[in-house]
Amino acid sequence: MTPPISPADATPVDSWLDMLQQVARHYGLPHSGQLAKLTGLWAGLDGEQARVRGMARALGLSVRFRPVGGREPLTGWRLPMIVRMADGALALVTAIGEDGEATLTLSGEAGLMAYRPIADIAREASMVVIARPARAAPDMRVDPYIHKQEENWLRRILWQ
């Protein structure tokens, strides 16, 4: 389990909001940034993890907190993932190349991409936050083929 973070070590609400909004945009979720920010400010006394969970819920996301290292290395199977560095900075890792080079965005840099080896990120990381949509999004490719149940459909066919 991830150790609790003391308020002195807590990352500001705006940094978490920036990262979580980028994940919500990645999944195409409609969201209200102001609602998420207010949720984060109101949940500030409950600890950083509770604050991040509340903000994620307001954005339509579900989050899991994972410690870095051990059996769960930083791999492409968990992308996009938010990485909290030892100094408190947040980074959103969006891609990992075959050569081990990660594409990431740092909080507060307005979406500018940076490239660093994933081994360096794993060495400096203190926690990984995996955010996914809270519920499945409708698939526009399949929806036209799915019809609602019609009552008396057999009778209508037989009486034609």
Where would I find each of the regions flagged by the language model?
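Membrane-integrated ABC transporters
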Residues: 1-160
